[in-house]
Amino acid sequence: MKVIMLDHDGVICLSNNWGSRYKKQIKVRTKLTQSVKELPVDARFDNFDKKAIKVLNEILEQTGAEIVVSSDWRIWCSVEEMGDYYESQGIIKRPIDFTGNVIDQSKVTWHRNWDSEGTRSLEIQAWLEQHPEVTHWVAIDDLDMSKKGISYSMEFEHEWGLDNFVWTSRINEGIKQVGIKDKILNFLD
């Protein structure tokens, strides 16, 4: 099985779309104290970039890869609800799973020097360890989770960073950046 570990912000939800969820939430909230999880799934998230979705769909069609959501958006919905949102935004495949949260599940001892990149790389590694059927995979994120991008001055019991990683460093371009699609395809071929 081929898998794309997909972040959203800075990959398919680009900086020009950030904040669009707040406009949607104003329209549907019945009371100010209403939890985000009580809102319709469409109102919980910012819109995806249409051109970024086109690139993602091309990759999915070419490779047959499945999607596992590594984005922190996963805390606001179920896999089923995220699949509904993907369909409403034009993504041709629903996610098959979310990566877990290694910190909340006490799989590791959290340290204050950790950042999102280190934690997310551990979550992806943990998911892959539980799914030996994965033959090809790539993580796509706007956080630099490459082994050279994550460095700590202290020693930890975990190996940080990912080998199969594509960094979308330009948050206003994301997956549309020149050369990004080819890098992703190289990991999935």
What label would you give each PLM region?
Residues 63-83:
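Substrate-recognition element of Asp-dependent hydrolases with the DxDx(T/V) motif
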Residues 1-64:
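Active-site neighborhood of HAD-like aspartate-dependent phosphohydrolases
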Residues 12-13, 75-77, 145-147:
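Short, active-site-adjacent cap segments at secondary-structure transitions
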Residues 42-46, 72, 114:
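Short, charged/polar micro-motifs that form catalytic or ligand-binding hotspots
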